[in-house]
Amino acid sequence: MDLLVPPSRDNSVVTFRLDTIGAGLVFADSLGKLTAALKSQGDGGTVVVQAPPGTGKTTLVPPLLANLVGERRRGQPRVVVTQPRRVAARSAARRLASLDGSRLGSRVGYTVRGESKSGSDTMVEFVTPGILLRRLLVDPGLEGTQAVILDEVHERGLETDLLVGMLAEVRELRGDLTLVAMSATLDAARFAALLGRSADGGAPAPVVDCPSALHALEVQWVPAAGQRLDDRGVAYSFLNHVAETTVAAHEEALMVNPDVDALVFLPGVREVSDVASRLRGRVQAGVEVLELHGQIGPDAQDRAVSGREPGDTPRIIVSTALAESSLTVPGVRLVIDSGLSREPRRDAGRGMSGLVTVSCSKASAEQRAGRAARQGPGRVVRCYDQQAFAAAPAHQTPEISVADLTSAALVLACWGAPGGRGLALPDAPPRAAMDDAVEVLRELGAVTVEGTVTDLGRTLAKVPADPRLARALLDGSTLVGRRLAAETVALVAGDQRAVGADLTKLLAAVRSGSHPAARRFAEDVKRMESLARQETSNTVDRQRIDSQRALDVSAREAPGFVVALAFPDRIARRVPGQGTPTYLLTSGTRAGLPAGSALAGHDWLAVAEVSRTQGRDAAGTGAVIRSAAPLSAELAAAAAPELLVEEVTARFAQGRVTARLERRLGALVLSMTPVRPSAEQGRHAVATALEKAGLSMIGWSAAADALRRRMALLYRELGDPWPDVSESALLARLDDWLAPELESMATGAPATTIDLADPLRRLLPWPEASALDSLVPERLQVPSGSRVRIEYPEVSDGSGGPDRTNMEPDGGSPVVAVKLQECFGWDRTPRLIEGRVPVLFHLLSPAGRPLAVTADLASFWSGPYSQVRAEMRGRYPKHPWPEDPWTALATSKTKNRM
């Protein structure tokens, strides 16, 4: 039987003509293997399809499944196909409907956010992953759907990963549901193992591999002279290099084949617009430059991905990763690759998430290159060198590993798998990121303490936006009106870029209808208004709303207020005294504004998006505000009452405890008033200062330091009962020796009035304390009669009890610095602590300069003294330098005064 031509059957459903649809498509040769793999599993089944981009899998597999399902159930089939992007879903549906010869929206249709062309007779429906996720939450059994195809699973989008796990569970309840995962890269075995867990006793799902359809592909390396990235992001010099390389390569290609179109890959919308603008000023007359990214309108997107007739105007299509794998752009024989891509990143420490520019993976680079050789020989020009390619990761980072998981956590809670527990996901979500996401949901009231979903959580999950925005839609509808709340949420949830980060200007543009996204925005607003109308009365926080109802929020202030309701941790106030506008957020994060932003004149902002960057716009903060709306101080406080606190803050500074009454909104100090601290507040301030600065916050007087050194030597040599007076030991037993002084400071006494010598004596053991002066005297009487101060060793932290290892002349011994002449006749070195510790003598010249260091006076007199005498007697003739120091009179005087 010819698999491309379905058998005639006596039913009303007209099947797809696969022979017509598959004409010229490489994957047509693999339909037999796919059919056999599915039929071998009976009703339903799971299969993984592995085929490079451009082979026709997205065009052929859906109608094949529709035919097989229709044949099996003798009725109209329904096959749902996910595409990672809206433009890809529309393009795939349009192409299949065209090949089928049917009207788009009848047998073949699509549904994306804000737009649907499908009906009851639709057999193949292309949708974005988010659409299917929300359908699953409403209808976990997917009644009326016989097959699901997850396309481009290799991209590892967060929503697609969730669908892999959730649909595997659906198949455990619905054995008749056919599930196919399609990948463009060599990672099929991973998904085969996951999807096979729920089928055939856990055996991997069969893999249908389609060989590459590449024609000859020339790879050219044209690296830029400088770096691709600088502290502002993608370097302008590199963008200029990409533009110049594109013009040169396309002109060269047109000389050989006038029908060659070029496809240029850049990481983001800004770079696409920049390079497209440069190209328009440099290309030959008659060459059209088109942009392809998520912020242009659907018509412009569709025009860019549509082919052209031979002889029509040659095109250069400048695209984000949108055209990497989920779209085939007809006519492309030349690819210019920047080698860069954007990936989500989450900064838990600063409460930020966003996109960062990184080198694309090897898999992405190969897919981009392959776009040039799908329909004939092609060429890829890589604007980087082979070393950079070799250093690139093999695959792009799974989004679940690096993205904000708040929306995903809500989906999982609604599914009955809080935190993803028990769900067979390609990669488990990071524990810390998931815990943070669940905590956000708890604060919203979307989940319980245990993590199970609440009624409010199920309502928030219906809104196609971040749960925080969904909650702001419901609360904001009551406070500012459904229309204004819906407009703000639709704008922030969309992917339109706010020039200068100014959301109010962007809102005015989409309202006017002149913006490319105006039509989709209007649809989103309409849908969100409807959701707000249905759900507000049952789910709003009445107590909170009643406290805010008295606010007079103007239409101009409404966007900022709604954003602040959604993201109270991102309410920001300008930091005074900064040349470049810098804002402090309630979360404690600092961020800059894009240069020239009209928002710079506002003291308060409600920030919808803030991301990491090291560019000029960050103003040295490491972050930049990407979208925000003005806010007043009053509305800021009203939007985040849970962050508003009045607190007395006491601190120990400049030697005493001071306090002030602070009124704060998160990290933002609204007002400060000096107050008298309570005793408890003072104690806390003193304890905090001690924890940070130790006893140096009080200071050691000379007397206290000397006593502490003597006590430390006793502890080192004798141990208990002599106390350990190291810093850590003293801090550990403050109540035993310093409690009265600490209480005095806590109630306002300055530290300068406290001498630690007397408190230290409280630690001396009794009756041993009476022997302190004899064991470790303050002074030592020398033969001249002088009483010379003994310099005891500095106290080391954690001295640890008896230890004789630190007795060398390196700072571990007690030292007496005395003039040499005062020690004549001293034949034995004095020892302290009952003879345990020798005194180290620093013998000085008459001018007080060191002549010798010794712990053995007898050896010094017998040896080195004669050399010292020979050198010094001429320099100091007025002082005695006897030949026999043993019998000479010790003196502190000159010879004339003796």
What kind of feature is each model-predicted range?
Residues D2-V5, R483-T582, S587, D603-R779, ...:
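Acidic, serine/threonine- and proline-rich low-complexity intrinsically disordered segments
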Residues M1-A472, Q534-Q548, V795-D797, R804:
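P-loop NTPase motor module signature
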Residues G596-A618, E794-L832, V837-V839, L843:
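Short, surface-exposed, low-complexity cationic segments
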Residues S106-V112, V562, P581, R787-R789:
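Long, charged, glycine-rich C-terminal linkers/tails
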Residues G130-I131, I317-L322, G339, L565-A566, ...:
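Conserved helicase core region in the C-terminal RecA-like lobe
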Residues L137-V138, L229-D230, D347, A392-H395, ...:
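Short conserved micro-motifs at the rims of enzyme active sites and ligand-binding pockets
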Residues T582-T586, R590-L593, A693-W700, L772-G800, ...:
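Amphipathic alpha-helical packing elements
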Residues K33, G56, L60, V87, ...:
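Generic recognition of stable, solvent-exposed alpha-helical segments in well-folded globular domains
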